[in-house]
Design a protein with these regions (language model features):
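Hydrophobic/small residue at the entry helix of a nucleotide-binding pocket
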Residues: 158
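Phosphate-binding beta-alpha-beta segment of Rossmann-like dinucleotide-binding domains, i.e.
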Residues: 88, 95-149, 161
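Short beta->alpha connector loops at strand-helix junctions that form conserved
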Residues: 30, 51, 73-74, 90-101
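NAD(P)-binding Rossmann-fold cofactor-contacting core
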Residues: 168-176
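Rossmann-fold NAD(P)-binding glycine/threonine-rich loop
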Residues: 78-90
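Hydrophobic Val/Ile/Leu positions in short beta-strands of Rossmann-like dinucleotide-binding domains
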Residues: 4, 150-152
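Rossmann-fold NAD(P) dinucleotide-binding segment
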Residues: 54-67
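N-terminal glycine-/charge-rich "phosphate-binding" loop or analogous flexible N-terminal tail
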Residues: 1-47
Length: 176
């Protein structure tokens, strides 16, 4: 049995077609349940799927005597008490790099928004002040992304995806 703490509609988006053929019972936590209540009602679950911000500590693990694995549906697992899992012989897994591409795109969007006064510019257009905003932007001598040097701390999946995209802008790239 797999107990899924996230909502079914989100899970179904990523669920592979062959999943229906697997001899596994999927149970989804009801929105009105706490994680502990869901664990108590599904004490025979051997695996739980959680999102990156679900707190999974001894209070949940102790309700699941058959638990063998906690799987984060994302990259993060910092809300899972890994020490408590280790003490109980429970594996903790994540989806390394699964969202690197979308995080890289989001990162570059934020860079462009900052360089191009995205939010103030949007607000100025709504208020009919786009000419005044244009003058402020020009006076600020804001560089284009191609004129920037970008430093990436670490060079894992997300940084590599970001670097690939930034290369097309022509900026200088550095990583540590």
């Amino acid at each position: 049995k797999i107990l899924v703490f996230g909502p079914r509609d989100r899970y179904d988006v990523y669920r592979p077609p062959f999943a229906d053929e697997m001899p596994v019972e999927l149970v989804f936590r009801r929105p009105d349940q706490t994680y502990v209540q869901a664990a108590q009602e599904n004490a025979d679950a051997r695996i739980i799927f959680v999102d990156a911000i679900t707190d999974v500590g001894p209070d949940v693990m102790d309700q699941l005597p058959e638990l063998k694995m906690i799987h984060s549906e994302g990259v993060g697992y910092n809300c899972i008490d890994c020490q408590a899992a280790r003490e109980r012989g429970i594996y903790v897994c994540n989806n390394k790099g699964c969202n690197a591409e979308s995080v890289a795109e989001h990162t570059i969007m934020l860079m462009l928004m900052a360089l191009r006064f995205g939010i103030p510019g949007h607000n100025a257009v709504i208020q009919g002040q786009q000419i005044q905003m244009k003058q402020k932007a020009i006076a600020a001598h804001a560089p284009g992304l191609f004129q920037c040097a970008v430093g990436l701390v670490g060079f894992g999946d997300t940084a590599q995806a970001t670097a690939r995209r930034l290369a097309s802008f022509g900026c200088k790239l550095y990583y540590y």
